[in-house]
Amino acid sequence: MDLVKQESKKKIGILGGTFDPAHRGHVSISKEAKKRFSLDKIIWAITKKNPFKGKSNLNLDKRIKYAKKINKNNLFIKVKYFENKVKSNRTIDLIKYIKRINKNAEIYFIMGADSLINFHKWKNSNLILSICHILVFDRDKYMAKSLNSVSYKKYSNKSIEFIRFKKVNISSSKLRKI
């Protein structure tokens, strides 16, 4: 009898955002997610505009180029822009698209604790939780807020994992002020 070699499921992380600009904090949480959850790759899905924030300072092309530049030695990180293919900037549409082209993959959506605060306002947030794991990384001043948020109270019994690790004291907002 032939033994059929069972292929293990591919594990794909998605870190979405404007990356305005990308920085070592994004790289650090990507490395930590890869290590803790044995992710095969992490896609940095760069969006033109965050629906919860104002206009980006850098144009899209510059943000993509810079994100690729800081990841030239991190071959597991793939910097992508999907909105022209997906025809949407909504996370649910991005996740469905990635699931469609990676049918058997397990998807891990990576976010900072600040993003969880408004997660209940995201389009189809309940559906997002049903089709992927959510990894919430600790972020200065936001962990307590996120644990007390409507989103956490609404979804705490779902697939949300909080990750505490050595913080990198940097943010895109701080960098833009320099």
Spell out what each predicted region is.
Residues 1-178:
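Nucleotidyltransferase catalytic core that binds NTPs
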